Amino acid sequence: MTGVAVPHRAELARQLIDARNRTLRLVDFDDAELRRQYDPLMSPLVWDLAHIGQQEELWLLRGGDPRRPGLLEPAVEQLYDAFVHPRASRVHLPLLSPAQARRFCATVRSAVLDALDRLPEDADTFAFGMVVSHEHQHDETMLQALNLRSGEPLLGSGTALPPGRPGVAGTSVLVPGGPFVLGVDLADEPYALDNERPAHVVDVPAFRIGRVPVTNAEWRAFIDDGGYRQRRWWSDAGWAYRCEAGLTAPQFWNPDGTRTRFGHVEDIPPDEPVQHVTYFEAEAYAAWAGARLPTEIEWEKACAWDPATGRRRRYPWGDAAPTAALANLGGDALRPAPVGAYPAGASACGAEQMLGDVWEWTSSPLRPWPGFTPMIYQRYSQPFFEGAGSGDYRVLRGGSWAVAADILRPSFRNWDHPIRRQIFAGVRLAWDVDRQTARPGPVGGC
């Protein structure tokens, strides 16, 4: 992978504006709607809106120093500290009104664009890229919240997607063994977040990985075969949670064979990647299928490494920026594309749809790469590393249909609790090259 130039100020301005336009579309509802909490897992949309502005002001106008005075009074600003106020509590806080939040965000953005325009050409612009990423990540969070909303739909059914391709579901590709470069440096990706860095060489034995993510039809076969009722496919923690939560199918699947998506009740497309499954469900499905979940290191090698050239690709298909012909990104579709829809987006090993569509659970806990150095926002990764005391997390890779193309790359690492399923997460299987069958455990019931 060759180094990537730091974006020019005009390109940064474009990214900031695109992110804000997307945010404003997601909050283009009346005040009562923006103040609602659709689920205790999520914030009211008006909290996300003001938090986006608060973080932008903190990092781009105040140098990341909360002691420097800002536009908000300290007592108001602390309402938007995600570490102080858990999501379930935010609906009860004396938040800015929707009109106040919009004005605050607009005032901050105007000052930020002025500051960007005055920056010297050789200035460090990492904080600007970090803020773009932060806003887009909250946009995806707001889409999760809107998907949990009950009542008449607020959003349409999404833009059209290319058709899938028969014969790819359930197939796998070989990833040769050997060393590869895991992670990136800032010279490779100027806005790579701290947990993606530094680049370093690791050796990975040969393995096979699913050509495409697991589909709804494949998941239906798991259900019909009693996969949710058979203890043998589940880990101890997974079975305990499956019984506690009464899991019988992916979230938003209805007993009549339909699903509910952003308030729309519709047939479940058999060739779409399954989404809204927990890590525990993904793990159980993999065991039932005679497979396993990939490690995140395996996933990144399958996505980015080109053994023919002995170097990383910037994207699975090469170094060219994502387009609508290569991946389903940006959120407009409001759903994953059918498997096989993007053959031109395949990685060097032949894996398809590795960026976009659904986040993919891996078996890996979140750990720092050797030589990890925290970025200016030191609380982004460190509190969530394994052993840091904030809970159990598993890494997800690849982004989803809701992720913006400006911020996604093969090295991007997401993470969540293994019980979360409101996220747009699915499954891609992996196999050791010398093992293709499951090893059933004990049978049991709840």
Swiss-Prot record:
EC number(s) given by UniProt: 1.14.99.50
Top EC class, one word: oxidoreductase
Catalysed conversion reaction: gamma-L-glutamyl-L-cysteine + hercynine + O2 = gamma-L-glutamyl-hercynylcysteine S-oxide + H2O
UniProt xrefs under InterPro entries: CTDL_fold (IPR016187), DinB-like (IPR024775), DinB/YfiT-like (IPR034660), EgtB (IPR017806), EgtB_Actinobacteria (IPR032890), Sulfatase_Mod_Factor_Kinase (IPR051043), SUMF_dom (IPR005532), SUMF_sf (IPR042095)
GO molecular-function terms, A-Z: gamma-glutamyl hercynylcysteine sulfoxide synthase activity; iron ion binding
Named cofactor requirement(s): Fe(2+)
Pathway(s) served: Amino-acid biosynthesis; ergothioneine biosynthesis
Outcome reported for the amino acid change (mutating residue 416 to N): 200-fold reduction in affinity for gamma-glutamylcysteine, but no significant change in that for hercynine and in the reaction rate
Record-listed gamma-L-glutamyl-L-cysteine binding positions: 87-90, 416, 420
Binding sites annotated in the UniProt record for Fe cation: 51, 134, 138
Domain of life: Bacteria
Keyword Zinc listed: no
Keyword terms: Iron, Metal-binding, Monooxygenase, Oxidoreductase
Family, similarity comment: Belongs to the EgtB family.
Assembly notes: Monomer.
Record function comment: Catalyzes the oxidative sulfurization of hercynine (N-alpha,N-alpha,N-alpha-trimethyl-L-histidine) into hercynyl-gamma-L-glutamyl-L-cysteine sulfoxide, a step in the biosynthesis pathway of ergothioneine.
NCBIfam families assigned to the protein according to its UniProt record, in alphabetical order: egtB_TIGR03440 (TIGR03440)
Name the UniProt record assigns to this protein: Hercynine oxygenase
Organism: Mycolicibacterium thermoresistibile (strain ATCC 19527 / DSM 44167 / CIP 105390 / JCM 6362 / NCTC 10409 / 316)
Protein encoded by which gene: egtB
